[in-house]
Structure formats: structure tokens, C-alpha cells
């Protein structure tokens, strides 16, 4: 059997960095090198301040870095020396050309494949870690075959990640399963077993599932689509609850106790975000359309449509509650990451809510404990989000939640950071304009509603009628928009 002694991972992002750090920790005899073209990112991985926030990640990196874990921009040497190469680069949704707004853009995958074959000799295992469309491995293999050399033997595997940001280290150390797909040839199965041997250092054999390459690729898309579907399903029920007096949390508890359904991913909110769910569902929609399965495509498109609707509905409630105008009103946005315990803002609902409120002329004061100021400005300056001068005129980044809420008409919770449960809301209420509104888009204040109402707040939340002074309103006049739409103006530097 092939023995893997050196691993190279191309891509030092949210997948490559944590995944290879855990492999290095669990396999001290394997030398792991993570490479990236972004020199600033590599410098951050080699510094005390890592480029991404993830609970437990810093301890893992510091225990291995400089021993058997290395971060470098020397991509070619790392490829040449490796027995196994992970491809862990971004696969964004296309914003132009055929399949724009849905299909995955594989230009970085293709660039990696060409660089690998250029710098390889002898036997090497190349493994997809990025989320890719079905048959992407076949595209990689075609590039390898078209550029082959004497004695070159490159085996292509699919090994999708199933980690969740915020619990990535826990998920990597104790995964539900490890999925490895490869060719059903003797050479392909030899490569599969070599990668299995790496994971068997800490993962029980019964949790390592092997399939053909296509099944592995589709399993990743399907898993994310099913999780996104559950969130959209419970969010659809939340709209019904607000109109009837039911509580979506009670409904979710009741249906979640059914063992056939289970209680995971039944938390109603302002909508799902992150770098995977929307991208992968849209990729699945495009795949179905390309295979002439329009009914299946429409089914999965509805998952995205419901997520968009939930965001627009929440923004409409904010505007409606504030006497149908937020023009020149200060609104505090608490939380900008797409979920707690991460600094990742990709497809964050905060971006969408901020866009809708900026379009109405609101002045936003934004606070997030882990998202840098520069990242917030970049996200809100996206050509599809704001006009040229909107961010400079309407957005202020606050150093703490109290500063953000000082003099505000309303505070809007967009990320479920635990610290938001512990704030001094009496202090906040005293400094806000009256009536003071709280819009809880993550239901983090559920146990505090009576106390907050006693203080004087008017509460609006997802899937529950709290304030008795108004009837929940579900308008549809806020127009749709998507970060995947092609920009109608040049992005700012």
C-alpha cells in the first residue's frame, strides 16, 4: 500500500487551514504544508493572529506549527515534494457567462490541476477538498491525461469536508463520517486506501465511507442542500406563526421530538448564510437544469427563494415598525458574521439586511466581536449592495455594542453571539430614542422578553408575536437582490 509521508494543501482558507492543522496534530509523522498565493494570508497563519477565527484552532496550530505543520507561498516545491495534494481553493458561483448566478466557477480548480501536473513526477494522489459539481474530478483527470509525462501517475480522489464553521475543530476531530470517492480500478482503490490510512490515525474505520468519485461529489452537494432545506422549511413556518399567534420554537420542539424528523437545523432565523449553502444549492439547481430535470431544479430553487423572502420579510418588519420610515434614523446592527463563533461573512444575512436598510436611508452602526472593520466595509461596498458613497455616508463601525446602540431608534440582532444575551439592556434602553425597538433575528433573547418589555423595549422576533401594539406585517415590495448577480458597476478598490 502507498504510504503518505508528505501532504500539500493548496488553499489556506476556512477549509484547508483547519483541516490540515488537525491532520498534522493527529499524524505527527506526516509533514503537512499548506500553500496559498495570498502572501498576507500565509503571513497571518505564521503569526500569533490567525487569518480566521475558529474555537480551538489557535491551540492546534501552535502545537504543530514549525514541527510538522508549515504555511508557505512556495507552491511548486510543496507540490513536487508531496505524496498527496489536497485542492482546497474557492469555487464561487459564476457571476458572468453561461450559468451565471448558479453554476460553480471552476477556474481555480483548473489552475490547480495544471500547476500540479506541471510540477509532478512519479506517483501522486490528488484529492478534491473544495465543494465541486459532479464530475469535476473527471475534468481534473482530463487535464492530467492531456499533459502526461513518462512515469507520471496521478490518481484523483474526492474527499469533501463536512465541517461546520464555529465547530470546525470539533467536527474534524470527531467527524460523523469521512467520505472518500475514487475510481473503481485497482489503482484508484489503492489511492483510496492510502488516504483511508491517514484518517484511521484518529477516525474509527466504520466511520470512513468509500464510494465512487461521482457519488462522493454529489453527496456533498446533497448534504448541504438538505440542511439548507430544513432551515428554509422552519423559516416558512415562522411566517405562519407570526400571523397566527403560534411560537415557532414550540412548533420546532414538537416536530423535532419525532425521531423521523429530529431536532437539528430547526432553528428559525433571519436566514442562512456562509460560503456553502446558497452556492451549493444553486449549483444543484444548475446541474438539474443541465440534465433536463426542470421540476427538480424548481424544487431546490425554492429553498433559495424562501431564504431571500425571510430576509426581505425581516427588513420589512423593521421599516414597518419604525413608523414606515428609517430615513436618517440610527439603527444598531449587532453581529455581522453569518453565524456565531466565526469571522466569516460570506452570504451573511447581515449584509442583506444592511443593504435593505441603507436603500431606505438608515444610518447603520455595526458591531461584531470577530469581524474586522475592513471586512465589513468591503462586504457593504460590493457593487450589488451599495452605491458609491453609501457606505461612507451611512455606515459606522462601532467598537462595542453600547456605542452602536447609543442614540439608536432600534437595535437589530443578526448574529447569535452569546455575548448579546449578557448585555446591560437597562443601560442600552436609557441611551436609545423612545420608543426603543429590539429586532431579534436570531431569537437569542427568548428568555428575556418579559424583562425587556418591563424595561420599556418593544420586541419583534422571528416566528413569534411579542409586541401587542401592532399586527405583524408581511409586505413584498422590497426588491430581491443577490451577491451572485453580475455587478452593474466596477467594484471599488
From Swiss-Prot:
Residue ranges of the region described as Allosteric switch region: 129-135
SUPFAM superfamilies reported for this sequence: 6-phosphogluconate dehydrogenase C-terminal domain-like (SSF48179), NAD(P)-binding Rossmann-fold domains (SSF51735), UDP-glucose/GDP-mannose dehydrogenase C-terminal domain (SSF52413)
Gene Ontology, cellular component aspect: nucleus
Domain of life: Eukaryota
Description of activity control: UDP-alpha-D-xylose (UDX) acts as a feedback inhibitor. It binds at the same site as the substrate, but functions as allosteric inhibitor by triggering a conformation change that disrupts the active hexameric ring structure and gives rise to an inactive, horseshoe-shaped hexamer.
Residues that bind substrate: 161-165, 220-224, 260, 267-273, 338-339, 442
Domain commentary: The protein goes through several conformation states during the reaction cycle, giving rise to hysteresis. In the initial state, the ligand-free protein is in an inactive conformation (E*). Substrate binding triggers a change to the active conformation (E). UDP-xylose binding triggers the transition to a distinct, inhibited conformation. The presence of an intrinsically disordered C-terminus promotes a more dynamic protein structure and favors a conformation with high affinity for UPD-xylose. The allosteric switch region moves by about 5 Angstroms when UDP-xylose is bound, and occupies part of the UDP-glucose binding site. At the same time it promotes domain movements that disrupt the active hexameric ring structure and lead to the formation of a horseshoe-shaped, inactive hexamer.
Any Gene Ontology biological process: neuron development
Stored InterPro entries: 6-PGluconate_DH-like_C_sf, NAD(P)-bd_dom_sf, UDP-Glc/GDP-Man, UDP-Glc/GDP-Man_DH_C, UDP-Glc/GDP-Man_DH_C_sf, UDP-Glc/GDP-Man_DH_dimer, UDP-Glc/GDP-Man_DH_N, UDPglc_DH_euk
Residues bearing the modification N6-acetyllysine: 107
Subunit structure: Homohexamer.
Pfam annotation, one family: UDPG_MGDP_dh_C
Positions annotated to bind NAD(+): 11-16, 36, 41, 89-93, 130-132, 165, 276-279, 346
EC number: 1.1.1.22
Single annotated GO MF: NAD binding
Region (Important for formation of active hexamer structure) location: 321-325
Function per UniProt: Catalyzes the formation of UDP-alpha-D-glucuronate, a constituent of complex glycosaminoglycans. Required for the biosynthesis of chondroitin sulfate and heparan sulfate. Required for embryonic development via its role in the biosynthesis of glycosaminoglycans. Required for proper brain and neuronal development.
Species per Swiss-Prot/TrEMBL record: Rattus norvegicus (Rat)
Region ranges (Disordered): 88-110, 466-493
UniProtKB keywords: Acetylation, Allosteric enzyme, Carbohydrate metabolism, NAD, Oxidoreductase, Phosphoprotein
Protein name listed in UniProt: UDP-glucose 6-dehydrogenase
